């Protein structure tokens, strides 16, 4: 994310700079078109498809005579709903940036490198915190903690409550909104491949859980993963404000490893044992049943490969830091390299994302001046 420089000159209409500076207003007008469409009978049917959740069904509650529950399933019309809430995510992104993060940046006087990373961590920490609270409330209300067998019991989980469907729609909308944000935030070309991989992994796993009717397992894994990621980005925010705050990274490193282990355990229990012992193991697209051996192996393989990739990046990052800090040096050079080591360790803290060093780890203008002096 680059720094958006405010100039006194108004850029030409429909130019790149004009769109970047006013993208929140443009998107707000587009979202208002859908909301205004609800007011007119001619356009109401089309507007409802974008604004409200689709595929609502009423099912009688088991064991309770005369009581019915309103549940949802997924379909092609969900793409329209995801598009509308993607617009909402772009607007909220701009609001957080302008009214919270930009004000903090002006007070802290960050370098260009720290500025972009502070914005990234600020946006993601807000999203992860909101998603954790929302997802945890669904888990508690549906009793997934007290009854973990429900993660695979009764599969396929074709129908799910309003809150769970809205949660998945919001997750997809947020990660799809990250694509245009690469343009709006003037992301550096060398950072785009890393961001595309990061966004693509989220969309791949969320869409997989949503389409394969593994929504319960996906919800639990997302909350677990988001909690660990929230700790990392909060630790990085505190580190940017004061470089003495480094204990948060130690806590994050421990929880990162535990999070990977818990993810693998839950996936093996649910997919490898729970679904493998289910009676209905035939592919039935009409009923949303994907419980066959090939799909189970594919699900486990994709999750295991992703977790192994994250751990490999994490271990390499930690080993690199450990070698740099523990490498023996002559006593005559220790005093000369003390300040250089401090700067290197600070860069590692700033550039780390999920245990990896990001590609925009170049020296900031401020640090260059210190070195030349």
Curated annotation (Swiss-Prot):
The lineage of its organism: Eukaryota, Metazoa, Chordata, Craniata, Vertebrata. It is found in: Endoplasmic reticulum membrane. Residues 333-344 have a biased composition (Basic residues). InterPro entries: TLC-dom, Translocation_assoc_membrane. This is Translocating chain-associated membrane protein 1-like 1. Residues 52-80, 142-158, 216-217, 270-291 are lumenal. It is a multi-pass membrane protein. It comes from Xenopus laevis. Residues 116-325 form the TLC domain. One of its GO terms (biological process) is SRP-dependent cotranslational protein targeting to membrane, translocation. Residues 353-362 have a biased composition (Polar residues). Belongs to the TRAM family. Stimulatory or required for the translocation of secretory proteins across the ER membrane. It comes from the Eukaryota. Pfam families: TRAM_LAG1_CLN8. Residues 2-30, 102-120, 180-194, 239-248, 313-373 are cytoplasmic. SMART domains: TLC. The keyword Cytoplasm does not apply. The chain crosses the membrane at residues 31-51, 81-101, 121-141, 159-179, 195-215, 218-238, 249-269, 292-312. Disulfide bonds: none annotated. Residues 325-373 are annotated as: Disordered. Keywords: Endoplasmic reticulum, Membrane, Protein transport, Translocation, Transmembrane, Transmembrane helix, Transport. GO terms for cellular component: endoplasmic reticulum membrane.
